[in-house]
Amino acid sequence: ATITVVNRCSYTVWPGALPGGGVRLDPGQRWALNMPAGTAGAAV
């Protein structure tokens, strides 16, 4: 499954995911997270 995080704010945000880390998202940018089948414990 893919989860897409979209920054709809007018400012930069720094979303994070566990496990994995985080990224910088400027306004309008997207971050696609590919979740392996069977993932049961994750947080964004």
Curated annotation (Swiss-Prot):
Keyword Ribosomal protein among UniProt keywords: no
Keyword field contains Oxidoreductase: no
Source organism superkingdom: Eukaryota
Name used for this protein in its record: Antifungal protein R
Alphabetized Gene3D superfamilies for the sequence: Thaumatin
Keyword annotations of the record: Antimicrobial, Fungicide, Plant defense
Function: Has antifungal activity. Inhibits the growth of Trichoderma viridae and Candida albicans.
Taxonomic classification: Eukaryota, Viridiplantae, Streptophyta, Embryophyta, Tracheophyta
InterPro entries assigned to the protein according to its UniProt record, in alphabetical order: Osmotin/thaumatin-like_sf, Thaumatin
Organism: Hordeum vulgare (Barley)
Protein's GO biological process: defense response to fungus; killing of cells of another organism
Family: Belongs to the thaumatin family.
